[in-house]
Amino acid sequence: MTKRTTIAARRVGLIDLGKATRQTKGLTQIQALDSVSGQFRDQLGLSAD
């Protein structure tokens, strides 16, 4: 993760993976991390490819 991405992630409050995992309790930890990655991409306007 680039420094810029990390700063942007902190700004939108998604850097707390523990919080993200709690919010997606029905998913495995890996799926929760995938979900957070998708949120990062959406927030930063990157493609999902």
From Swiss-Prot:
Temperature-dependent activity: Unthreads upon heat treatment.
InterPro entries: Lasso_benenodin (IPR049805)
GO cellular-component term (any): cytoplasm
Post-translational note: This lasso peptide is hydrolyzed to a linear form by the isopeptidase AtxE2, in vitro. The isopeptidase AtxE2 only recognizes the threaded form (but not the unthreaded form).
GO BP term, pick one: defense response to bacterium
Coiled coil regions, renumbered to chain: none
Proregion positions: 1-25
Any matching Pfam family: Subterisin
Protein name: Astexin-2
Annotated compartments: Cytoplasm; Secreted
Cross-link (Isoaspartyl glycine isopeptide (Gly-Asp)): 26-34
Organism: Asticcacaulis excentricus (strain ATCC 15261 / DSM 4724 / KCTC 12464 / NCIMB 9791 / VKM B-1370 / CB 48)
Taxonomy of the source species: Bacteria, Pseudomonadati, Pseudomonadota, Alphaproteobacteria, Caulobacterales
Function: Shows weak antimicrobial activity against its phylogenetic relative Caulobacter crescentus. Does not show activity against other bacteria tested (E.coli, Vibrio sp, Burkhoderia thailandensis, and Salmonella newport).
Domain characteristics, as noted in the entry: Is composed of a ring composed by 9 residues, a 5 residue-loop (SVSGQ) and a C-terminal tail. The peptide is threaded when the C-terminal tail is inserted throught the isopeptide-bonded ring. The loop region serves as a recognition element for the isopeptidase AtxE2.
Source taxon at top rank: Bacteria
Record key words, sorted: Antibiotic, Antimicrobial, Cytoplasm, Isopeptide bond, Secreted
